[in-house]
């Protein structure tokens, strides 16, 4: 077994939702977490700036001896994942994919809502995924305005959090969305608020973090298993 750590990187605290899933699913793995709190949030920054910040962060994790890196940030994945995989070809890099597929497969109403940062929603990865799985599905999108700041400032259980989530979520529910995709790793910290706002209306919230955790094990095994002797 390769005992080097797995690096997990995010713009701030959001990637801890992914870190938690990797720890739960792969307790034998050592993990190193890097949160770029100095530059958080990334959502409205230009793509080239996000790419530079992601490069610096991944470079630090490579320098720390990580065997692979999980870019636990949807915005950084959208802006930089192709560049990172080209530059750091010697190691596997796992990114965040929008959980549009399971939402589209499970919707009963034919309407899916996706909450993410502006940069993520503008990215090719989201557009390709929505086009591939969203045929005959109405995909609504909205920026989670203020969500990241609530989490970073430890206000996710405040009355302000309830009103902030309600303001963004209610229009999607009124339009018939029965699946809400959390397209930013900060957003799962607000899950109790989402459930409070949704109540008994039968709307599912899709968190992509468990799926990323499930990907890390096979990628690690495929790329990093020791050669037979």
Model regions: which residues?
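Non-catalytic structural scaffold of enzyme domains
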Residues: 1-225
